[in-house]
Design a protein with these regions (language model features):
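A short, well-structured juxtamembrane/interface segment
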Residues: 65-76
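Major-groove recognition helix of helix-turn-helix-like DNA-binding domains
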Residues: 28-47
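Short Lys/Arg-enriched helix C-cap and helix-to-coil transition segments
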Residues: 51-67
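Short edge-strand/loop segments of extracellular domains
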Residues: 22
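Single, function-defining residue in the core of a domain
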Residues: 1-14, 18, 47, 54-55, ...
Length: 361
């Protein structure tokens, strides 16, 4: 399945034929042989996708132990590092499927889709929670499950689709700081207006309580409402943010929510670079297998980025790996010197020969 991701295979025949054509190098992997189409189809349908899920978390844990810098995030800069707290970003993305072939994921009359819920560590850009399911359920139903691993003192940022006042009350009681957008239909009453900062982007800063009887029963405490101008695509838009923290500056609240867009970059990377458009099977199990292997490849590529100080785009790394898939090349040297004038890499062996480290130089 990782091979299918790297080659952007659009069908079972693509995988089987390509592996059969490279049977020589493939046999060097403990005598591996290319699967038949029927065997691959049966495994894709019957083999429990929980195996792929466990493999993903096991590999991620191993890589984090292998390199502490990979776990903590060497890319954490600016706001993420200034807060010196773990910052979680929560969002979901729909993965389009073929409605005529897939009935388990139909969520509209003529559409079918799977939904990927992710809680991302903002410092390391690594997933901390992943849920793959049908797109039928609303995001707010999964809010408590997605945020179950957040610890007291940490920060969680999510879109207004995840707003559930029972869940917000639980987070507040557990000592978790949260930031989200306010729904347009939110009914509230202002109890205190906070001093307005000098930043002209901040339009108002106030403490509010909910007016709706049921909502106030679920969240009786006052919450902070910040109204600010946020630049999106070169234009300033007015947005309203809610948080349970009253000590941060209003500018920090707005900047924190803006960091949530990092998860949009994550979804863009896996959906544009990896194979999440054409699926090798129509069953729920087959779709989950392909999603989990895509996430596994993302983690492996993220590890390569951090350890080799890769300065180019994620897509460029993917195309480079795909081009060198059947070449016995020192990958670290290739990534380290890629794009540098005079940079070089060395072959570990000719493509069709066995690689026996320690026997020959």
């Amino acid at each position: 399945m990782l091979f299918a991701q790297l080659t952007h295979a659009i069908g079972l025949n693509d995988v089987c034929d390509a592996l059969r054509l490279h049977s020589g190098p493939l046999s060097a992997l403990r005598g591996a042989t290319a699967p038949s189409r029927n065997n691959l189809s049966h495994a894709n349908k019957r083999r429990d996708a929980t195996l792929a899920e466990r493999l993903f978390w096991t590999v991620l844990e191993h890589l984090q132990k292998l390199s502490p810098g990979f776990a903590t995030g060497r890319q954490g800069k600016g706001l993420a590092r200034r807060f010196r707290r773990v910052i979680h970003v929560v969002d979901s993305s729909t993965i389009a499927l073929i409605a005529s072939c897939i009935d388990w994921a139909q969520h509209r009359r003529r559409k079918a889709a799977a939904k990927l819920h992710v809680r991302l560590d903002l410092h390391s850009l690594l997933p901390r929670f992943v849920l793959v399911e049908s797109a039928k359920a609303a995001d707010s139903i999964r809010a408590a499950e997605v945020c179950a691993g957040v610890k007291p003192g940490e920060i969680v940022i999510f879109d207004r689709a995840y707003v559930d006042f029972i869940h917000l009350g639980v987070l507040n009681g557990d000592g978790v700081f949260w930031v989200t957008r306010s729904k347009e239909s939110l009914c509230f009453r202002v109890v205190k207006r906070l001093p307005k900062p000098t930043d002209k982007r901040i339009l108002s800063d106030e403490l509010v309580v909910l007016k709706n009887k049921d909502s106030r029963a679920n969240y009786p405490e006052a919450m902070r409402r910040v109204r600010a101008l946020v630049e999106i695509d070169g234009k300033e838009r007015e947005m309203e943010f809610l948080t349970n923290n009253v000590s941060w500056s209003a500018t920090s609240v707005a900047d924190l929510y803006r960091c949530r867009w990092q998860i949009e970059v994550f979804f863009k990377q896996i959906k544009q670079s990896l194979q999440l458009c054409d699926f090798l099977g129509n069953s729920a199990n087959a779709v989950r297998w392909q999603v989990w292997t895509a996430l596994l490849l993302y983690v492996l590529m993220r590890f390569l980025c951090v350890m080799s100080s890769w300065s180019h785009s994620f897509t460029r790394l993917f195309t480079l790996l795909r081009a060198t898939l059947w070449r016995k090349i020192d990958l670290w040297d290739l990534l380290r010197f890629y794009g540098i004038a005079g940079g070089h890499f060395r072959y570990l062996a000719t493509p069709q020969s066995a690689y026996l480290p320690g026997f020959a130089q």
